[in-house]
Amino acid sequence: MSAAFLGNVVEKDIHKSSLIASITFALGMAGTGFFIYYGGQHKGSLLSLIGIYICYGFIMGIGLGTGYLSPVKTLMLWFQDKKGLATGLAVAGFGAAKAIASPIMQWLLGDNQNGEIYKMFFILAVVYFIMMFAGHILLAKPADWHEPSGDEKKPGIMEVLKTKPLTNYIGIWVMFYLNITCGLALISQEKMIVKCIGLAGSVGIISTVSAIFNAGGRLGFSAWADKMKDRNTIYKLIFILSIAFTAIVMLTGGIKNAEGNILLIIFVLALIFMVNAGYGGGFSNVPTLLSDHYGMGSISAIHGITLSAWAFAGLTGNQVASRVD
């Protein structure tokens, strides 16, 4: 939700927002490590639990949302003829992180029986801060882009949204919400599904491949959308493909009957990879779709509000999946 509340900060000053993101993300990571350590020294400590929630959930959340928004508009300004490709590159890293960071975290954890998990958070806090601060220093808008000065009246978000029928924006928000909810519903059950089809020993490999599809979907679908007259078409394509793959698996009883059946295993894996790609593609196409409708003037703020759909989907997607047999 931090993206929804801090979109205006990103809009006004990307250097300030990227610095806020760097500091809060690293601080939240280090704070989480500290409270894990504190909890190890004081068994059953409520303070430790509260501290972890605040650091990992709230402080890191501010860094995550603000950092996610900061480079998007800038890249669209630099590559206005290839906005989809530009935003795809920006958010592909978000999807690829699972493939890159997971094995590194596993290596840092090592034998976690010694109760030194907190060290991983301290190390990651330093690494992430260095990388994010480097990005903060390099981030810059094109010299020919004019941002309204303090003396110039800039329309508010609602004024911008009202330039089109409000149902237009509501439709985009709902479409994005459904895309993310359905994606999270399957992705949250990914490991269990892989085990059900008899590939328990390959969970890590499949998880890495699905992360690559996630990142590839962010890049591929957004770049593809650059060639389309209407970016809504890419969402229709994602939904049709996702429904088709789901229908094939459901009609063949793939998940329940796949163990030992190579064809059904392929169907199930194809579904997992397709949903990951569509989930990523949904993310990368939102900012460019919004810019096509509402222009670039307040895109960071509007994009931030739209990402509230991601927050709500995070609350409901896993709940939906847990209630489906």
List each model region and its residues.
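Helix-to-loop junctions at the C-terminal end of transmembrane segments
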Residues: S2-I14, R218-D230, D325
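Structural signature of the two symmetry-related core transmembrane helices
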Residues: K16-G31, T233-V249
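Hydrophobic core of transmembrane alpha-helices in multi-pass small-molecule transporters
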Residues: G28, K43-T66, Y177, L263-G281
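Intracellular juxtamembrane helix-capping segments at the cytosolic ends
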Residues: G65-F79, A86-T87, G280-Y294
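A late C-terminal transmembrane helix in Major Facilitator Superfamily
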Residues: L89, K98, Y279, S291-D325
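Helix-loop-helix hairpin linking two adjacent transmembrane segments in secondary transporters
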Residues: F94-A143
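Extracytoplasmic gate region of multi-pass secondary transporters
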Residues: S102, P165-A223, F283, P287-L290, ...
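Flexible cytoplasmic inter-helical loops of multi-pass small-molecule transporters
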Residues: A140-M158
